[in-house]
């Protein structure tokens, strides 16, 4: 098993796996220069709904605030060519993930190359696509929805044999959960800074449980953000190029900032999207 906080217990699978989005072939990193090809020119002529959508997305980005709810654009009934052109135009950005919702529904999320613009595909328990949206938001609403029913407390038994620091860590987590209010700064517990035995980590995993959301951010390195079974408690692990954990933390917060689009991202993405529309769709 790989070292770090969030390791599935022996014999169990991971609670959630980052997976290719939707029932279609996996999205690949696509260069925007596709739009300059002859194939794209013909597709753009056919796909007027996409041409109409892009300025609406830019307008939404112009007024979006990081702390406000996002805006959804339903493309479920768009023709296949339009949806493919949207995929090509938006590309694949740094953050992707999945959220398990009620009734077996899964929200599969991919940020565009324009930060703060997300492609959200909802699939049923059999993997069939049931809805397809573009969302302008700091983080998709499905993430908060999936976590809304988690308990705001933790319970556990006595310390196991071989425990070193798990009990004070659990006390700290429980205290921070009880005190946390929306908008409070994140409280970070860094496991890299003090010793935790394997018994500590196993007991901590069992006490917190598995949550319904997993996100991966790929920028200069890889960061995996996993919701635990306690509200506002997240495992945040940073990996190097060898897929080795270099920083292992828990964050008590609404959603870790590493996965969230910032205020300036919306303005930058608005400008970029308008440039694309002017160059290829106008």
Curated annotation (Swiss-Prot):
Cysteines joined through disulfide linkages: none
Protein name as it appears in the record: Hydrogenase expression/formation protein HupH
Family stated for the protein in its record: Belongs to the HupH/HyaF family.
Sorted UniProt keywords: Nickel
Classification via InterPro entries: HupH_C_sf, HupH_Hydgase_express_prot_C
Function recorded in the entry: Not known. Could enhance the incorporation of nickel to the hydrogenase.
A Pfam family annotated for this UniProt entry: HupH_C
């Amino acid at each position: 098993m790989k070292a770090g906080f969030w390791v599935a217990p022996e014999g169990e699978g991971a609670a959630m796996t980052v997976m290719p989005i939707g029932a279609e072939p996996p999205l690949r990193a696509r260069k925007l220069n596709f739009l300059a090809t002859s194939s794209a020119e013909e597709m753009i002529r056919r796909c007027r709904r996409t041409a109409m959508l892009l300025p609406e997305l830019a307008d939404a980005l112009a007024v979006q605030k990081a702390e406000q709810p996002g805006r959804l654009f339903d493309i479920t009934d768009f023709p296949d060519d339009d949806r493919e052109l949207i995929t090509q135009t938006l590309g694949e950005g740094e953050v992707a993930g999945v959220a398990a919702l009620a009734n077996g529904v899964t929200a599969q999320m991919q940020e565009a190359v324009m930060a703060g613009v997300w492609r959200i595909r909802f699939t049923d328990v059999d993997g069939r696509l049931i809805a397809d949206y573009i969302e302008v938001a700091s983080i998709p609403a499905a993430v908060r929805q999936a976590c809304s029913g988690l308990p705001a407390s933790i319970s556990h038994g006595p310390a196991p044999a071989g425990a070193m620091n798990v009990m004070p860590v659990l006390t700290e987590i429980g205290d921070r959960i009880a005190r946390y209010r929306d908008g409070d700064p994140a409280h970070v517990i860094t496991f890299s800074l003090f010793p935790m035995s394997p018994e500590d980590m196993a007991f901590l995993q069992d006490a917190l449980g598995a949550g319904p959301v997993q996100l991966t951010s790929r920028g200069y390195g890889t960061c995996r953000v996993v919701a635990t079974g306690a509200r506002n408690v997240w495992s945040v692990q940073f990996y190097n190029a060898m897929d080795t954990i270099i920083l292992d933390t828990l964050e008590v917060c609404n959603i870790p900032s590493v996965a969230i689009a910032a205020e300036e991202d919306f303005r930058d993405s608005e400008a970029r999207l308008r440039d694309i529309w002017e160059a290829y769709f106008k």
